[in-house]
């Protein structure tokens, strides 16, 4: 079994005095023998606090790699403070794969010009074409694309770029083409650069800019793997036919086959074993063994330190408590690597019986093998505050604008008359009379007005990019292994329920889970319309520190970037959409907010479905509580084994939950996460640019 990666803590005297940590026995005393018949499930032991402090009192020198390992196992929320990552100053930051909390470390994108977003959208569409990697070298086909880009209306393109921006109607539509000749030629050059890499790897980095990328592939999932996974779905659906688990709040349209919100780790309820002894072969032997971990009533106070997560002057940089849960945590399964480099589960997948479904375990192991190259492609490692390791594009396609002022006539076309299009009056915006910021005229849709137009910058000269990842998580974390959270779900539509609504913007998990990347396997779609995942990111609120402009003279910049830069201009960047078609693998880092689009039945007289496997990668830099620590909590699993075993004990261990209790915890967990998502969305929306404050 892979060793747990020991987190290196910083604990000062104030923490030791003010924060009460759970009392857990030393490593040597916490071992539980699988064959033991003693009932060891008990409340927290009363071993001395000094034993825990011994885990926590390592010097900061350990953070620089001077101490590679520690005796024992350490987990945030157990024998480390739940908010242990808050302890670092900027000069102490350890490596992480960022998590997309509002204004979090490593999760902000540089603001992109509308032309760059348009380029990303155009290239995303072109790489969906069959044999795009060959067509992009065919001059006749490219000329046809060029003519389409030159003549087609850009209204839809512009509205997608500006979608969700509450003040975008105050920014005039560019009168010049967004897709200029230079922009189009850059796109073709970039696609020709990506084509050989796609042929070699099957991977397409898409919607990529400045160190952030999404990865799609329609041939990464082999026919054999797809067959294995489809068989897994059919097996589970058949076994659960008499007791279908419809996800709460989905109007009985989302069937959970495996979901981490059922039987999660529950503080002060779940049995816990400090050392990672519960594996998939002996998991049920540990039922009833272990200790409770008390609910966390107060987070550690690290004082006014600059921390590694986020910094907002109004709250000293502390993370809002809603971002972490002191009640629940999803349970990942531990994954090690065999000698040949392939993935192997060393602990059970929560809610997937390890004895009943060995073939499904094998299939998901193969899916992890498939996902790792895509994760390597899209993960960005933050080594230090100003040092990052990433694959592919790591800078904008446009020169950074450091100085721009509306009084500079070279930034504008000469005065001209143009018509404000009627087609921008969408029913989800309240269009009426609008004011053009640069001139102050009243603009009425469909009327001719007089004004000047911003000259949009052209992209830099194209330079080839090496998309090869500089490192692989399989090699980097070979000794410690990975932790992966698994979800298997089927969206079922019927003539009575023909429409699936769009989802909400979110990142995956809370900070407890430390999810750093997602891999989605779209296995099977029948009689449903196309669906997409939409992506967006937060941008830095401190843009005014980098761009010099006069007082309130930033209207040209607003037109270039397609956003308000004064009060109320949210620091949110739309990246675009990726189709979630059958047979596709989609991977992305957990720095993007994303949401699923709505879809419906094609033929509303027949049922339809969309089925997918989700793999969520826990940041391997920091170990969290997993199924290697928590014996199975499903009472029915134990009951089946107990009945089959001759002379088995009849008393039900107190650590087990009924389905009804697990469902109650799921509802509470979902309610807690809804509050977190609302808080995160509020914090993201309230971050605004401050160009008006000079």
Regions found by a protein language model. Give the residues of each.
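Fe(II)/2-oxoglutarate oxygenase catalytic core
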Residues: 2-5, 9-25, 33, 39-585, ...
